[in-house]
């Protein structure tokens, strides 16, 4: 899709001028938030959620201009086209149909002669049957003992989303299954897991589309060797989530990597968008039970429908995306924090960090032309109130950055009602959640400079009724849709990630040097650049001239 250069748009120039106006003293948030109708005008309620942006540095004109920008860039049409199977991943000539994973309708979608609707139903059925058989003790390890540990072996999008959801819904977990994540190729990660599991009752879930990802295969091979050392047949303890026809998509002892069962993932679902596919479906169904996983999917689908069909002014992820553009390109904040006041959401920020930064960390348009403006910002976060004792000093009195606060009305554990200072723990949490956005927005003047707060620091608050599987699904899909909408405004492709390729290529060259040294102790690193050679010699020795 050809689009005009952003900075040439009259709307873009109007937004630039309006951002200067919003910097005037009379538009400080301490004044804007005093308006009686501020919350009603600058918040959206839908799907048992509230998206409150009343403490963003916007007025009605700013929102109207941003909505015009969304219309000009045809982002809603592009989002709808994405959900029906259009080729929106233009650099790889692929659809991006992560939303199909959680769509239980019979609407037919065909991509590259694949009936996507039928394939999604097939994969969900296979996941249900497998997870229920494991829970019933019908599928066991080599010694006949039921599985009690599940280890997800994957990296990046192959585990981060699953880890977020598993942590968020741990209160709903099957208490007979412990879930572990082996992502880092660092042997310390493997060693810690090896000490925590019972090999006889461990099921390894290898997640790799190609079954060639260096870190994942190094860990998978390490796990297979470990199981053999315990006298166990890896083929009875390994399942794969991979693409059709990959080396991991085969069972039996003659397979390149024998597995008990394989589940399919598809090239029209990117890793960072894949938690609702078999990538998350297999481990989460084992950990939570399939029915809870399906409820999670249906929550995500509700948000997908909202994101695709709600009018722009009442569309939560679209509004969040436009505010992201505003804060980044017009107010020039280089980062955003995600602060959930709910410890089960501790892994949300790392997931969104990868989702957003890998999707939108681009410098060229989908057509390969210079973008001309900054795209993605740095995403980081920590649960509240922990974050208040970590980086909130900087948030209040140092370099400002926008924050998404997330609050939950009903905690997963509501039986604990002891009072301290007259309130429960959950109420104490909320006292802080209510106060922090206000303090950031309003600030406080003081003759003592050390006690002066400039305020005017923007934030949004996302309110969830509970942390049920459906609510977590909605939250996941909210951030996915927000990420995609921002990309569509910029005209970039949020579904490729060529930025990771150069480092991988150089790592392959270094790996070859290491392998040569392992084969021949006399091998020298004379063909390697001097800086890399220093580290290789520190790690493996110099060779002939030692």
UniProtKB/Swiss-Prot annotation:
Q: Does the keyword Flavoprotein apply?
A: no
Q: Which GO annotations describe the biological process of this protein? A: gluconeogenesis; glucose 6-phosphate metabolic process; glycolytic process
What's the domain of life for this entry? Answer: Bacteria
Q: What is its EC number?
A: 5.3.1.9
List the active site: 358 (proton donor), 389, 504
What Gene3D superfamilies does this protein's entry cite?
1.10.1390.10, Glucose-6-phosphate isomerase like protein, domain 1
Q: What class of enzyme is it?
A: isomerase
Catalyses which reaction? alpha-D-glucose 6-phosphate = beta-D-fructose 6-phosphate
Provide the alphabetized UniProt keywords: Cytoplasm, Gluconeogenesis, Glycolysis, Isomerase
Q: Which InterPro entries match?
A: G6P_Isomerase (IPR001672), G6P_Isomerase_C (IPR023096), Phosphoglucose_isomerase_CS (IPR018189), SIS_dom_sf (IPR046348), SIS_PGI_1 (IPR035476), SIS_PGI_2 (IPR035482)
Q: Name one GO cellular component term.
A: cytosol
Where is the protein localized?
Answer: Cytoplasm
Q: In which pathway does it act?
A: Carbohydrate biosynthesis; gluconeogenesis; Carbohydrate degradation; glycolysis; D-glyceraldehyde 3-phosphate and glycerone phosphate from D-glucose: step 2/4
Which CDD domains does the annotation name?
Answer: SIS_PGI_1 (cd05015), SIS_PGI_2 (cd05016)
Give GO terms: molecular function aspect only: carbohydrate derivative binding; glucose-6-phosphate isomerase activity; monosaccharide binding
Q: Which family does the entry's similarity section mention? A: Belongs to the GPI family.
Q: What does this protein do?
A: Catalyzes the reversible isomerization of glucose-6-phosphate to fructose-6-phosphate.
Name this protein carries in UniProt: Glucose-6-phosphate isomerase
Q: Which organism is it from?
A: Desulfosudis oleivorans (strain DSM 6200 / JCM 39069 / Hxd3)
As recorded in Swiss-Prot or TrEMBL, the protein's gene is named pgi
């Amino acid at each position: 899709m050809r689009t005009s250069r952003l900075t040439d748009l009259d709307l873009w120039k109007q937004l630039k001028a309006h951002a200067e106006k919003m910097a005037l003293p009379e538009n400080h948030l301490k004044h804007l938030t005093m308006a009686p109708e501020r919350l009603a005008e600058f918040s959206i309620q839908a799907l048992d959620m509230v998206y409150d942006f009343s403490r963003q540095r916007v007025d009605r004109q700013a929102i109207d201009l941003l909505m015009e920008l969304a219309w000009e860039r045809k982002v809603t049409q592009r989002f709808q086209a994405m959900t029906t199977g259009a080729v929106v991943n233009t650099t790889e000539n692929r659809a991006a149909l992560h939303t199909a994973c959680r769509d239980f309708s019979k609407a037919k979608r065909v991509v590259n002669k694949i009936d996507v609707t039928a394939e999604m139903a097939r994969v969900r059925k296979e996941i249900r049957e497998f997870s229920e058989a494991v829970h019933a003790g019908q599928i066991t390890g080599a010694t006949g003992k039921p599985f009690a540990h599940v280890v997800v072996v994957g990296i990046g999008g192959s585990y981060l989303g699953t880890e977020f959801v598993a942590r968020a819904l741990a209160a709903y977990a099957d208490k007979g299954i412990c879930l572990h994540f082996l992502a880092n190729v660092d042997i310390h990660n493997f060693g810690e897991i090896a000490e925590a599991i019972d090999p006889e009752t461990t099921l390894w879930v290898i997640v790799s589309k190609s079954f060639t990802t260096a870190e994942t295969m190094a860990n998978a091979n390490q796990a297979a060797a470990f199981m053999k050392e315990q006298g166990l047949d890896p083929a009875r303890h390994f399942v794969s989530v991979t693409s059709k026809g990959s080396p991991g998509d085969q069972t039996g002892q003659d397979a390149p990597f024998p597995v008990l069962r394989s589940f399919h993932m598809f090239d029209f679902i990117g890793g960072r968008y894949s938690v609702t596919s078999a990538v998350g479906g297999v481990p989460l169904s084992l950990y939570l039970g399939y029915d809870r996983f399906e409820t999670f999917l249906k929550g995500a689908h509700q948000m997908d429908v909202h994101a695709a069909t709600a009018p722009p002014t009442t569309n939560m992820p679209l509004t969040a995306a436009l505010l992201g553009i505003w804060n980044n390109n017009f107010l020039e904040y280089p980062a955003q924090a995600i602060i959930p006041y709910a410890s089960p959401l501790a892994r949300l920020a790392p997931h969104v960090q990868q989702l957003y930064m890998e999707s939108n960390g681009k410098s060229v348009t989908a057509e390969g032309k210079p973008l001309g403006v900054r795209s993605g910002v740095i995403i980081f976060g920590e649960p509240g109130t922990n974050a208040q004792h970590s980086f909130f000093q900087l948030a209040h009195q140092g370099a400002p950055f926008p924050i998404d606060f997330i609050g939950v009305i009903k905690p997963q554990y509501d039986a604990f009602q002891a009072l301290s200072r007259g309130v429960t723990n959950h109420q104490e949490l909320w006292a802080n959640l209510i106060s922090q956005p206000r303090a950031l927005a309003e600030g406080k003047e003081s003759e003592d400079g050390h006690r002066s707060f400039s305020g005017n620091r923007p934030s949004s608050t996302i309110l969830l009724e509970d942390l049920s599987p459906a609510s977590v699904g909605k939250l996941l899909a909210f951030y996915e849709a927000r990420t995609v909408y921002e990309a569509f405004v910029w005209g970039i492709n949020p579904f490729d990630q060529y930025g990771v390729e150069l480092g991988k290529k150089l790592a392959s060259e270094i790996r070859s040097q290491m392998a040569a040294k392992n084969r021949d102790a006399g091998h020298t690193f004379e063909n390697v650049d001097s800086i890399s050679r220093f580290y290789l010699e520190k790690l493996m020795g110099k060779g002939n001239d030692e």
